[in-house]
Amino acid sequence: MRKMKKVLSLAMTAAMTASLLTGMGAVTASAKKSDDGKRTKITALLNSTESTEQYQVYDYLLKNFCDEKGIDYEIEMVNDKQDYFTKLQMYINSDTLPDIFGCPNGTLSKACKDIDALVDLGAELDRNGYADKMNGAVRDFLTDADDGNLYLFPQGLYCEFFMYRKDLFEKAGIKETPTTWKEFEEDCQKLADIGEIPVIIGGSDVWQIMRYLSFSPWRVTGPEFITGYQAGTDSFAKNEAAKYGVNLVYDLGTKGYFEPGFASVDYTSATNLFYGGTGGIFYSGSGQINLAEDMYDAGQIGFFPVPDTEEMDNMETNIPIHAGFGIGYNKATYDDTMQEFFDYACEHYSARLI
């Protein structure tokens, strides 16, 4: 058992700190221009399919803007998240990033910043008058911890929480939603005892497991553990809340609380499983609220926040918020046309989301 825990810890550590090789050569990215030096195309890279929100928004914005300007646009889409990260890293390594690209706030955005590939969008928002119109929580989430600048444009304002099936909780004799992780595991066992899958998870998408690994240190330390971990001043071995998170993931996985074969189930499939009627609990969020609407209105599902880590001092905040998959603008190709597009996006982005 100790060996399995060690393997899990090492796997999670590897996922958090996978080495990111940055390109060392001269910048080779350039805007698509005609012989007379005028831009002819805007390029984009998105972690999307044609049915996802971010693609539909940027396809709408780019189509209308480019039609006005008489230029073309091209959106490269990669659906699988890990494949997308690999593709984005390849562009970073070779300094050939497209004009705009989806980029998570964290290791990959830092890799972009390390090669000076990101436009300071905070300064651009100050210039075009939209700085005060951005939601403060979103701006805080995306603000760079090192220099205080804003390099990513938000996808939106989202919150995350646990959805649960009320009928299964009632059938299992669970009268209240769990407020601690100990209660969470007890409820999982009660669901298993009646032959139901306690928790649905998209285990092949590493971020899903990482959520469970991070819940305890987040509730107890806020951002302190992850920043300390990245700086090399903290570790799973030293931090009790983080150690609790490792044990939690181990218990949920080895006690059969996740669905069979969870490690090969992606997030989309997990979503379809839960909202299709399988499983008692699913970690979801406001980005999927449309899927939950009918079941919620019918009184079939409810939600609860991230539980407390028992016997530790937890912060009051128990609903994570984030800005989605941010958009970066390539500094090397940020010409007058791209600046005009950024202003156009600021003006029309919210209207397109409504």
Regions found by a protein language model. Give the residues of each.
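Short helix-initiation/N-cap motifs at beta->coil->alpha
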Residues: 78-87, 106, 179-186, 261-275
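Hinge/lid segment of periplasmic solute-binding proteins
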Residues: 106-161, 185, 212, 241, ...
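Short, solvent-exposed loop/beta-turn-alpha elements that line the ligand-binding surface or hinge
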Residues: 122-136, 220-244, 294-295, 308-318
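Glycine-centered hinge/linker elements that transmit conformational signals in sensory
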Residues: 188-190, 231-263
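Extracytoplasmic/periplasmic substrate-recognition and gating elements
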Residues: 38-40, 63-64, 68, 94, ...
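Extracytoplasmic/periplasmic solute-binding protein
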Residues: 145-155, 160, 185-234, 250
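A local structural motif
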Residues: 68-78, 172-176, 251-264, 295-300
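Conserved N-terminal structural module of periplasmic/extracytoplasmic solute-binding proteins
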Residues: 6-9, 21-115, 127-132, 176, ...
